[in-house]
């Protein structure tokens, strides 16, 4: 946790200061974008500001006519482009076959994982020292979940974390579930 705070102080704070300085300098030049002229593109994580004609004229007057205002145009991504980008990032995941099940699932079953009745999934309840340790455990797992784009079904109550793993895209267990379960075991063992 301390590492995260230090990282935030050293990385985020200077960048926020740069943004604040940029905003202050644009205000001094008479550039005041209005809400109606501000457009954002969440998919590209960029902010485009289009100044009104009155704001551009005020900037030219304030700088003696030498203000060179640029308009930034974001081309919105179409659904097809977004799908193509996602498809490139995702690897094809397939359901475990019988040989892979026997080979990869058995060590997890020996470690306390159980098969869920009525669906192709595995379940385990992790009992940790207290809520802070349970939350740290979930945070560590969430980092991998985001990285591999595979999120567990879980429930937390004080020091207990119930986890169910299954891959919805293939309708059952996949190598992603095995990887996630192994990571859960490793993370839980580190916290003991």
Swiss-Prot record:
GO molecular function: 4-alpha-hydroxytetrahydrobiopterin dehydratase activity
SUPFAM superfamilies for the chain: PCD-like
Enzyme type, top EC level: lyase
Gene Ontology CC: mitochondrion
Alphabetically ordered keywords of this record: Lyase
Superkingdom of the source species: Eukaryota
Cross-referenced InterPro entries: PCD_sf, Pterin_deHydtase
Catalytic activity: (4aS,6R)-4a-hydroxy-L-erythro-5,6,7,8-tetrahydrobiopterin = (6R)-L-erythro-6,7-dihydrobiopterin + H2O
Any single Pfam family the record assigns to this protein: Pterin_4a
NCBIfam families to which the protein is assigned, alphabetical: PRK00823.1-3
Entry's family note: Belongs to the pterin-4-alpha-carbinolamine dehydratase family.
UniProt-recorded name of the protein: Pterin-4-alpha-carbinolamine dehydratase
Native organism: Drosophila melanogaster (Fruit fly)
Gene coding for it: Pcd
